[in-house]
Amino acid sequence: MNIRKNFKIKFIRLFKKLSILFLLSSFILPSERNSSFKFSQHTDIDSWWISNNNFGKNFKESFFDFYHTRTLGKAFFKINITNSYSSNDIPKFGETYLRYDFSKNTHLIAGRFYRTYSNYMNNELSSGHMLISNNARPMPKLGLNGKFKIKRNKDVYFSWGISHAKFKKNQYYTDAPFLHEKFVYIHYNFKKKHFLSVGLAHEAIWAGTTTEIGSINNPGNQPDTVKDFLKVFISADGPLIEGEKHANALGAHSGIWDFNYFKKENGKELSIYYQHYFEDTSSLRFANKTDGLWGIEASNYFKNTKILLEYLNTSNCCIDPPYQNDNYYWNYQYLDGWKYENMIIGNPFVNNGGPRDELKLIHLGLSYTLENKKINLKMSKINKTRWQSDYSNKIRYKIAYSFFIQSINVELFYGDDKKNNSGGFNLSYKF
């Protein structure tokens, strides 16, 4: 049974019907809604932190964004329309989705959205989540999420989710592959001020049709039946390919062990986290040691200030071949790797220069707010990389200052990475 075309047709039809129905009813019935329009103007050469972690948008000299959110009963709708995804100014959807709450603990979400786990992440200041950051345009997805509590202990609960998404055709894929996503977390609340969560998130590229250039081994139609999906779900082995010593897992897999400690007391917040990255059984068992993203964020320890410090390590990806020998975000069959529309889906520093571009990175994020004024700073420095260059250890930063003129929010920004420097402004109006 081939499920690729069948799923695509049904998903598109369902999302269009739900979107039209929701929009029409939201204008008729009472609801909570917010709308805003944003115009941006800046130089045509982009530095690192202006072109990365900005929702995959192609920052031209000028572009616009329209945002709208609406709550109607058990339904929530978010829409972003922008011309920054097209070279010819054609408006396209950014983060746009419909969420429907079946109950207090279960909801369906459909459209273009990022992730529904690792909610502790500060996407505005972070260098980027290890699996799904705001670096690329959100993929079209259909997901079901929920949570349930332990009856004997009200301080413990589980959260879970499963999603199905689709990539796009490109030079590597004549028929775009699917993305399978799932996660499960356990959360513990201690004395209502200490929170601990531990979870496992899993992503897998599967199905599709790869080209000769797009697949070093076994190009052509990739396994895509329901039986194959079940293998992808449990990371079971696919067929043995000629020349290989053993069968590999079906599809291209990646995931994280996700640890977070959160404390809230006297108006102050502290979050400590570690995302241990893995792509196979060996790295799942920590054979790649401390690879992944470490972070700490402190809020209001200095009044109206958020300080975030992160350490990114990918230097242990290939320390024990063939046992521990992962090219993070890359795959021998799905050669476009962990990308969507030519942008890395996860942390933009990971293998951005190509396979085995191992690195150690320090990242600082800072935010200060006073009344209607705000300053944001992001600063990153690679301390070690496999492919050393004069550019590798340079500081890359972006600073932004925003304020209000009547009802218009004005943001001025400047970025520099020692190769390029660029600046500009954003004007936002909420109505």
Features from the language model and the residues they span:
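Transmembrane beta-barrel strands of outer-membrane/channel proteins
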Residues: 35-47, 79-85, 108-114, 158-166, ...
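Outer-membrane beta-barrel pore domains
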Residues: 240-431
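Outer-membrane beta-barrel initiation region
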Residues: 31-70, 247-255
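Outer membrane beta-barrel
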Residues: 76-170, 174, 178-207
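Extracellular loop and loop/strand-boundary signature of outer-membrane beta-barrel proteins
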Residues: 51-54, 82-84, 126-132, 168-173, ...
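A conserved mid-domain beta-alpha-beta active-site/ligand-binding segment of alpha/beta enzyme cores
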Residues: 195-257
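Short loop/turn motifs that connect adjacent beta-strands in outer-membrane beta-barrel proteins
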Residues: 31-34, 68-77, 104-108, 149-158, ...
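Bacterial Sec-dependent N-terminal signal peptides
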Residues: 1-32, 427-431
